[in-house]
Amino acid sequence: MAVPGEAEEEATVYLVVSGIPSVLRSAHLRSYFSQFREERGGGFLCFHYRHRPERAPPQAAPNSALIPTDPAAEGQLLSQTSATDVRPLSTRDSTPIQTRTCCCVISVRGLAQAQRLIRMYSGRRWLDSHGTWLPGRCLIRRLRLPTEASGLGSFPFKTRKELQSWKAENEAFTLADLKQLPELNPPVLMPRGNVGTPLRVFLELIRACRLPPRIITQLQLQFPKTGSSRRYGNVPFEYEDSETVEQEELVYTAEGEEIPQGTYLADIPASPCGEPEEEVGKEEEEESHSDEDDDRGEEWERHEALHEDVTGQERTTEQLFEEEIELKWEKGGSGLVFYTDAQFWQEEEGDFDEQTADDWDVDMSVYYDRDGGDKDARDSVQMRLEQRLRDGQEDGSVIERQVGTFERHTKGIGRKVMERQGWAEGQGLGCRCSGVPEALDSDGQHPRCKRGLGYHGEKLQPFGQLKRPRRNGLGLISTIYDEPLPQDQTESLLRRQPPTSMKFRTDMAFVRGSSCASDSPSLPD
């Protein structure tokens, strides 16, 4: 790695990125810091991620996202991260780290770029390449050496305490030790590290045939499609007497996922600022969840349930369908000599009073709670259930229906009473335990034995089975498209389908083709 000049050395600012989840790799960090890395005239001087572990702090500091004010503590902190020291880096995180996290020492050019990087990413949530939130936050802090902060590196005089506390030369972490860290010495093919090297550098290496293919796979490099650079279209037009409104800069990943701010979100393992979990739960309860099914029927949802396509956006209005009929004069009729769909649906909706009824006096809680609602609401649901049973839309089998729901409250009471009176498992009943210890099996007895428990009577012998008549018509060839879609299923008792679903259709089961399907059905003699 080339030795930088003095001017560049003065402009270099070192920072520590801590709180990195161990599951993240360099490819994920490239996607996370892509917006800052690909900026023209900016970016990282070096960001080479090497999965350096860090220790969890004993106590969390309240404002650790800010720059620490004790430079001596930072120098002592970085002294633990030398290449010869195997102890992990100890950082002060704002959240109690429960999982293993890592850190990395990076460098940027100039104090302005360092402040911009801290403002963009420090305190934000971690995201992977798929946009999934990860526990913890990104914490970026400026790294200052003790000599750099005090400016008294060559001061010859020392205090009595400094003279008494002897320290070896190899224990003092200097700028030379900082430059020897593996994070600040990336390989030649990645001059700014596996995270900080922009895509244009890899493109130049590809043009020069110097980039191995494995680096593209490891870093998951995705190059933009070739096209015009749009040098003139990217220049904004400045209007006269225009005022620019400063807005908060949004940060995005390489996949276009927005990285949310970390000051208003609660961490997954624990709350960041020591807030009790009850307050966080109250804030979640105060949020409006109008799309949930259990919202007890607000005004707009109630209006939507009573009227079809209230906004006119679903385009469910009936199209004109003409069919000649024999017209019968009827009072209040349309007088048309042909049958229309609109006329049929208008008759289904009822008269004017029924169409304009708001039903505000109907208790809608019966649709959410089985035992809720007043008597009128429960009777309405019962009438709807009976109508569906008559139409065959509801399964009215008594066998499959659960019998004895009261056993949920009474099951096990008899056993508790007997155990209280001294009964144990495997003993008979009575004071002498002379009863049968086990209950009788309900399997019955031998089928040829015609008396006693388990005899069901004579078995009816059928004299003749009726043959199924053959179909005279040709068979209907079904296709996979005949199967109804999930949104076209029949309505349930307490919920209705959206107005876009198909209400009337002939259900035809799809039968996959076989060798027997090619044979044409033979006509009866």
Swiss-Prot record:
Recall the GO molecular function terms of this protein's record: nucleic acid binding
Organs and tissues of expression: Expressed in ocular tissues including retinal pigment epithelium, cornea, ciliary muscle and non-pigmented ciliary epithelium. Also expressed in optic nerve, cartilage, skin and lymph node.
Resulting phenotype, V23M: Found in a patient with primary congenital glaucoma; uncertain significance
Q: Does the keyword Cytoplasm apply?
A: yes
- Which Pfam families does this UniProt record tie to the protein? G-patch
Q: Name one GO biological process term.
A: negative regulation of RIG-I signaling pathway
Per UniProt, the keywords (alphabetical) are: Cytoplasm, Disease variant, Glaucoma, Nucleus, Transcription, Transcription regulation
Comp. bias intervals (Basic and acidic residues): 299-316
InterPro entries (alphabetical): G_patch_dom, GPATCH3
**Main location group:** nucleus
Annotated G-patch domain ranges read 410-458
**Quaternary arrangement and interactors, per the entry?**
Interacts with mitochondrial MAVS; the interaction is markedly increased upon viral infection.
Q: What does this protein do?
A: Involved in transcriptional regulation. It is able to activate transcription from the CXCR4 promoter and therefore it might control neural crest cell migration involved in ocular and craniofacial development. Is a negative regulator of immune antiviral response, acting via down-regulation of RIG-I-like receptors signaling and inhibition of type I interferon production. The control mechanism involves interaction with mitochondrial MAVS and inhibition of MAVS assembly with downstream proteins implicated in antiviral response, such as TBK1 and TRAF6.
Tell me what this protein is called: G patch domain-containing protein 3
